[in-house]
Amino acid sequence: EYSFEMNAYNRTLLSQIQRASRSADAMRLYPGAFSETLVQLMKEKKLSNKKLADASLVGERTIQRLRNEEEYPTTVQTVLGLCYGLQLSVPEAEMLVGKTDFNIKPTNPQNNAYRCVLSSCAENSIYEVNEMLESCGFEPLGSSKLG
């Protein structure tokens, strides 16, 4: 019995905390490269390129290229879109972003907003988060051109 309300958000957060040790062990086993990690995460979540494209607002061809070409140019919005499509926990999302050249420093207003939304990858849809970001004048997550 807990003293806090067991709503959907708290249930998800408690579950993530309970799995923290296992999750940390698992993250140490991911490959060093972004592309290989993306492939492994998609496999674990049983997501095809099409399903991930629908959930992340990143084009299927872009996902295919990111899986196959380590040096394929991308944007922070695309990577964060993938975090949403994969429904990653905060540590998993930070791990995936950490395998890119992006540094999401909180001193930049847009980056600070992106850091805030990273915490809801497992709870919110990308559509909800994009509506919030755009209402505040920030670029939405996903690919601008779905190719």
Model-identified regions with their sequence ranges:
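A short, Lys/Arg-rich alpha-helix, primarily the initiator
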Residues: 15-47, 126-146
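Key DNA-contact positions within bacterial/archaeal DNA-binding proteins
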Residues: 50, 61, 91
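Short, basic-rich loop-to-helix N-cap that marks the start of a DNA-contacting helix
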Residues: 70-84
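Short alpha-helical "recognition helix" segments of helix-turn-helix
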Residues: 48-55, 82
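Conserved hydrophobic/aromatic packing and binding residues within compact polymer-binding modules
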Residues: 38, 52-53, 63-66
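Short, charged recognition helix plus adjacent turn
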Residues: 3-5, 13-14, 94-124, 143-144
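Recognition helix of helix-turn-helix/homeodomain-like DNA-binding domains
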Residues: 57-74, 98-99
